């Protein structure tokens, strides 16, 4: 079974290491974020950024994107072989914002990729530090998850916009490795597989020859990753069918869409990590904090602590609400785009609003936007409590598959019961249980029908005071369960465009 070995702590996935004990994991994750921090400080020096400019999240994102681009080998090779007008394949850059005479000005910078790689390696003890790069990719992915909706992408692959809570990590690049795979939602994996199958249907040679053999290996690997996310035997058996298909086609697409729907109730395991912008790690390193010595975890109190003492700024457009901008970034920092708003609100200590009610656009500023009217404000990224991040999908008990929480993919391991109208979801499953997977489909539908909405998931798990770093006194919040707390309801956000 290919999913064996996937149950190691995901900090290990982050650091690519062999099995390590908790202390070693904390040290290697600490080394990773410390390296990001050192790199950021060095870049600020190179660019002569003031302290304030270095804390601007837009500058942080530009610097992060530059290093990701500098190490994107596939794209670099492609750019060298297909030179396009006005693009130097050896250079990378982006907008840097500086404060001049009381105004923000945009300056486009260009750097040799080689130079960026040198600075990155120097900050990471001479290593390529792929784990740190993946960490930045996951931060960007979490930011996209909180900012954009993927309705169009869902519809294009024949899925339903109601499945948006399954789309975590849908903008992660392919090269994000094992750590990237753990944070991808069921819908994201299904979408990647459907795209692959569609190419195979349209292009006769897709599965043929030497290239086809590699394609096939990638296909089976993706199937195994998805299979490892499901927690019931019937869902896994269906994945085996999809993986072993001689010539994947429409039948497999049907099966995958069925499985994605089933994941709305029989939730998959999807990891959540608090990945922060590079400038936050930079600030901590600059103040003398030694991440490797102190140790660090992406799923415990550490990111909350770090955000309690970091001041980060953001550019604000004329009609945007700074509090809403803060909420967006807070959600991205904790990978909470698909969490129940009531849980997020309780932890954050201020109301977290659904996205349709936010007066803010994305964090990044387009090159054609007018800088004259730009202001900046402090992002409020502090929290009232902290909670452990989950990777289970929030099923009430792992022995028998039970109801996960509809339209959310829990981020925090905090007790809640699951308000959902089973009828709405079951309506998606009318009819089609024939075909070669009929027995599995019947079994999955039976499990979904038996899922009890009143079950409590994460029983006894609670949030913790920020002074309680050993997580000794769980506070179990009680929620008003009358309304479903999905961030995506009444949505009017922009679509994600590459």
Swiss-Prot record:
Its main location: virion. SUPFAM superfamilies: flu NP-like. It comes from the Viruses. GO terms for biological process: symbiont entry into host cell; viral penetration into host nucleus. Pfam families: Flu_NP (PF00506). A motif (Unconventional nuclear localization signal) lies at residues 1-18. InterPro entries: Flu_NP. HAMAP family: INFV_NCAP. Homomultimerizes to form the nucleocapsid. May bind host exportin-1/XPO1. Binds to viral genomic RNA. Protein-RNA contacts are mediated by a combination of electrostatic interactions between positively charged residues and the phosphate backbone and planar interactions between aromatic side chains and bases. This is Nucleoprotein. It comes from Influenza A virus (strain A/Duck/Hong Kong/2986.1/2000 H5N1 genotype C).
């Amino acid at each position: 079974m290919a999913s064996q070995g996937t149950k190691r702590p995901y900090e290990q996935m982050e650091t690519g290491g062999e099995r390590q004990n908790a202390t070693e994991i904390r040290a290697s994750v600490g080394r990773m974020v410390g390296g990001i921090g050192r790199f950021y400080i060095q870049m600020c020096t190179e660019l002569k950024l003031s302290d304030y400019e270095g804390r601007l999240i837009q500058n942080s994102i530009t610097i992060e994107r530059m290093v990701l681009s500098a190490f994107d080998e596939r794209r670099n090779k492609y750019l060298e072989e297909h030179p396009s007008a006005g693009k130097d394949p050896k250079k990378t850059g982006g907008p840097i914002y500086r404060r001049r005479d009381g105004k923000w000005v945009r300056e486009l910078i260009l750097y040799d990729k080689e130079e960026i790689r040198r600075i990155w390696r120097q900050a990471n003890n001479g290593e390529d530090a792929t784990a740190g790069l993946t960490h930045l990719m996951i931060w960007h992915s979490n930011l996209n998850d909180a900012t954009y909706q993927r309705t169009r992408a869902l519809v294009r692959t024949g899925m339903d916009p109601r499945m948006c809570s399954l789309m975590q990590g849908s903008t992660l690049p392919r090269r994000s490795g094992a750590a990237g795979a753990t944070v991808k939602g069921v819908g994201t994996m299904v979408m990647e597989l459907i795209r692959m199958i569609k190419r195979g249907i349209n292009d006769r040679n897709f599965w043929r020859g030497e290239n086809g053999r590699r394609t096939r290996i990638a296909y089976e690997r993706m199937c195994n990753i998805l299979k490892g996310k499901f927690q019931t035997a019937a869902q896994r058996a269906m994945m085996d069918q999809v993986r072993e298909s001689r010539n994947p086609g429409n039948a497999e697409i049907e099966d995958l869409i069925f499985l994605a729907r089933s994941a709305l109730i029989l939730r998959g395991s999807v990891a959540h990590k608090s990945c922060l912008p590079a400038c936050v790690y930079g600030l901590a390193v600059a103040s003398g904090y030694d991440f490797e010595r102190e140790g660090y975890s992406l799923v415990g109190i550490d990111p909350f602590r770090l955000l309690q003492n970091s001041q980060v700024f953001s550019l604000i457009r004329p009609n945007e609400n700074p509090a809403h901008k803060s909420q967006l970034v807070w959600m991205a920092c904790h990978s909470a785009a698909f969490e129940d708003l009531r849980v997020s609100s309780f932890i954050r200590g201020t109301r977290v609003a659904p996205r349709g009610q936010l007066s803010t656009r994305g964090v990044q500023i387009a090159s054609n936007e007018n800088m004259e009217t730009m202001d900046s404000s402090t992002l409020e990224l502090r929290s009232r409590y902290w909670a452990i991040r989950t990777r289970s999908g929030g099923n009430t008990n792992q022995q028998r598959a039970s109801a996960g929480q509809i339209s959310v993919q829990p981020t925090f391991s905090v007790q809640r019961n699951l308000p959902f109208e089973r009828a709405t979801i079951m309506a998606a499953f009318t009819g089609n249980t024939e075909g070669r997977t009929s027995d599995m489909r019947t079994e999955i539908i039976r499990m979904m029908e038996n899922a009890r909405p009143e079950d409590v998931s994460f029983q006894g798990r609670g949030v913790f005071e920020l002074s309680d770093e050993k997580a000794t006194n769980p506070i179990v919040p009680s929620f008003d369960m009358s309304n479903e707390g999905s961030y995506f309801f009444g949505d009017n956000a922009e679509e994600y465009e590459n």
